[in-house]
Amino acid sequence: MTESLMVAINFFSLLSFVITIKNAMDKLGNYITGKWIEGDGAGQELYNAVTGKVITNATTEGLDFEGMLQYAREKGNSALRKMTFQERGRMLRALALHLMDKKEKFYAVSVLSGATRVDSWIDIEGGIGNLFSNASLRRKLPDETFALDGDPIALSKGNTFMGHHLLVPKEGAAVHINAYNFPVWGMLEKIAVNLLAGMPAIVKPATVTSYLTEAVVREIVASGILPEGALQLICGSAGNLLSHVNSQDVVTFTGSASTGLKLKAHPNILAESVPFNMEADSLNCIVLGKDVTPGMPEWDIFIKEVRKEMTVKAGQKCTAIRRIFVPENRLEEVSKHIHAELAKTTIGNPLNEKVRMGALAGQGQREEVRSQVQKLLASSQIIYGSLDSVAVIDADAQVGAFLSPLLLLNTTPFESYEPHNVEAFGPVSTIMPYKNTDDAITLSKKGKGSLVSTIVTADPEIAKQYVMGAATHHGRILVLNAECAKESTGHGSPLPSLVHGGPGRAGGGEEMGGLRGVKHYLQRTAIQGSPSMITAISNVYQPHAKGIDNGAMHPFKKYFEELTIGDQITTQKRLITAEDIDKFADLSGDHFYAHIKDTDFGDTMFEQQVAHGYFIMSAAAGLFVDSYDKNPVLLNYGIDELRFTKPVYPGTSIYVRFTCKEKIAQEMKEKNPDVEFVKGSDIPKGIVKWYVEIFDDKDEAAGVGTILTMVQMKNKI
C-alpha cells in the first residue's frame, strides 16, 4: 500500500468522524465568555465544497457581543498584561507544538473546503509556523510586561533631563474579521501577534469555512495553554460587535476591498478613533523581464510561478497573480507555455492523490468568480479554460464548486479598465503585453495599490529599475531568478517576519513584519524625566543615571537573580603606552597607518600614534572583568552599540564605569528523555547587558558600548 493511499484512507476515516460529529451537533459552536454556546435559530447552512452536501450550520443570533468585549478586556487582557514578553512567547511556542501534534485532524476538516493537501499545508502548518515565528521574537524583547522603543534622547546640557518611548499593551481586545480562503492561517497569523503583545482576541472567521477555524479553536481551548479570555470565537454574523469597540481595541479586516471600506467607515470606528487595519484582495501582478528568453532558467521559473499561483487554493489567495505582464514580442510564446502548464493540472476531489487543484470554497464563490469574469470579458478573451465546463476526478463538476483555470488575454492594457479594476477571486489571471520596463512599472501601478508584485529577471539593472519604480504601489516585491528560485518562498507567500499589506486598493494596512506587527497592539508613550527616574521606570539603565555602589562585591560574583539594574563599579586606571599599541598591532595584524608611530600625521585627523579602538575595548575588559575565580558568568555573548568617541594617545590613562543595564531570563532547553543529559549542554541562565563607559585621565568619554554576558541562575524557570 502506497503512503499516499494510506494518507487518503486516514483522511476518509477522519472525515467520516468529522461529518458524524457535525451532524450530531447540527450547529457550530461559538466560544465566548469562557464557554461554548450555540447561536439561536437555524443559521446559515455550510456546505461541503466537493459534494455540495450540508455539513453544519452557523449562527450567532442571540449572542451578547458587548459582553464578549467586556469579558476580553476584564479577563483576557488583565491576564495577558501580567505576563512578560518572554512568558507570552513561551506560551505561543507551547501552543504551536500542541497544534502541530493535532494537525491531521485539521487536514481532515480542511478537505471539506475543497482544499488539496498542499493547499491545506499552507493554511494549517503555515498558520502554526506563524506561532513559532512570533514565539521566537521574545528573544528580541525584554523580560518585562512592557518595552522601550528606540534610543534614549538627551534633552539637557547637564544630562539631568531625558526622554524615551515606552510601549505598553492596549487595554482592549483585538477583533479579527477574517476571509474564507485561509481559515487557520488567517486566524493564527493575527492572534500570534496580539497575544505576544499582550492583547486578547475575538476572532470572526468568514462563515463559509468557519467550521475549520472552529475545529482549531476547540483544540486551543482544550489545551488550556492560553489564559481565560485570551481567545473568543464567533461563527456567523458579527452582529453589532463593532458598535461596542472603543479606542483601546484594535480591529483588523481581511477580505474584499468593498466590504473593508464599509467596515472602516463604521460610525463607532470613526467616533472612537479605533485603530483599523485593512488587508484587501488586490490585483497583484508578475512581470517577465525583457532580458528573459526561452531556454533561460528564468523563463521556466516564470511559467511555473504563474501556474502555481493560478491553481494553488484554486486561485483563492489575496496574493494570487491576477495580472501577467510580458514583453510584447514574447506574448504569444508565453501564452502557449502557460496554456501547456495549465493543461497538466488535474482537478477534482482533493482526496484523490492525482488531484492538483480542488474546488472553490462553495457554489456562491464559484458564481461570484463567473460573474467577475464576465466583466473582464468586456475587454479580454479567454485563451485557456471554460466558464461552463471542467473535467474533474472523483467528483461531480456541477454539484461541487469546481471551476476550470481561466487564462485571459488583453492586448490593450493601457486603454482597458477591467483588468486593473475587476478581480475574479479564483483560478483566473489576465496576460498583457508591455513595451519596456517603464511601461511595466506604469501598468503595475494601474492596480491602484497591491499586496505583492514579482519580477522575474536575471538583470540587476532591470530589477532595480522595477523595484524603485513600483515600490510606492506595492506592499512586497519579489525579485525572482535562477539564483534564488529553489529556496524562494514564492510570489504568494506572506512571511511572518516581513510586512503583509499594501497601499491603496490593498487596504493601506500593514500586518506581521516581526516586531513591526507587535507594535500595532502596543501604545507608544513618550516619557520624560531624570535618567535615574527613567531607569527606575523602565528597568533599563539609562546613561547618566545614578548607579548602585557594590562596594567590595564585584557584580560578576552575583547570580542572575542577585543582580540589580544599576549595579555599578568604577575600575582602577591603566596607562596606555606606545609599546602596548605596537604589540597589539603585531598581535592582531592591524597595522593601519594611524597606529604606527613613524607615520607623518600632518594631513590626518590625529596628532600622533593612536591606540586601536579594539585594543582600548580589550584593555577595558581587563579592567572590569573579575578574572581570577570561577563565578556565575558563563561566557561573553557579544557586543552591542560600541562607539569610540575620542582618540587615546600613548601616555593616556583610562578607566571604566561598568553598570548592569538590562536582564533577560532564558528558559531551559527541553530535555529529550531518551538522550542522556551531557553536563554543560544547558544550565539555568540569563543574558545580562552591561553598559561600559571608558574614560580618559581628563574624565572625558573615550568609548561607550554594551556588552552581553550569559550569567548562571540559581533557579530554573
Task: Locate the predicted segments by residue.
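N-terminal Rossmann-like NAD(P)+-binding subdomain of aldehyde/semialdehyde dehydrogenases
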Residues: 18-159, 344, 361, 370, ...
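Conserved C-terminal structural/oligomerization subdomain of aldehyde/semialdehyde dehydrogenase
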Residues: 50-57, 225-228, 247-250, 340, ...
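Short, well-ordered beta-strand elements within core beta-sheets of diverse protein domains
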Residues: 54-61, 76-81, 155, 175-176, ...
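Rossmann-like NAD(P) dinucleotide-binding subdomain of oxidoreductase/dehydrogenase enzymes
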Residues: 142-301, 434, 487, 509
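ALDH superfamily catalytic-core signature
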Residues: 222-224, 250, 259-414, 438, ...
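Catalytic strand-loop segment that frames the active site of acyl-thioester-processing enzymes
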Residues: 551-611, 713
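HotDog/MaoC-like acyl-thioester-processing domains
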Residues: 555-565, 644, 648-717
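Hydrophobic beta-strand-centered segment that forms part of the acyl-chain substrate-binding groove
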Residues: 602-611, 615-664, 671
